[in-house]
Amino acid sequence: MVFIESTAFTRRLRELADENAEDVLNAIQDDLLANPQRGSIVQGLGGIRKARTGDPVRGKGKRGGLRYWYLYLERRHHIHLLILLNKDEQEDLSYRERATLRQMVAELKRI
């Protein structure tokens, strides 16, 4: 499996997880390797899934921790990590973020 991080995902990972960024990324990757379809599909986003992971900086488990959105392209064995958010800051995507993700998915599926 190949993991591909968007610039936005990587930036937020560093901001939110600080020196624990590698641990958070490993936890996400381990979860997705075990089950690439683990997250729930977000309606209207072309197959993007939303899942949870813990937040070691704030001492939160999966329920109160971080949310991430990803696209699993099964044929290519690629997982695109797209967005990472702190649940306390923002639990779901804005209209603008959803529109941007729809465009990203269209491009990724074309390649």
Where are these regions (language model features)?
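Basic, Lys/Arg-enriched alpha-helical interface segments
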Residues: 1-62, 75-76, 90-111
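Short, conserved catalytic or interaction motifs in soluble domains
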Residues: 87
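Short, hydrophobic/aromatic-rich beta-strand segments within well-structured domains
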Residues: 65-84
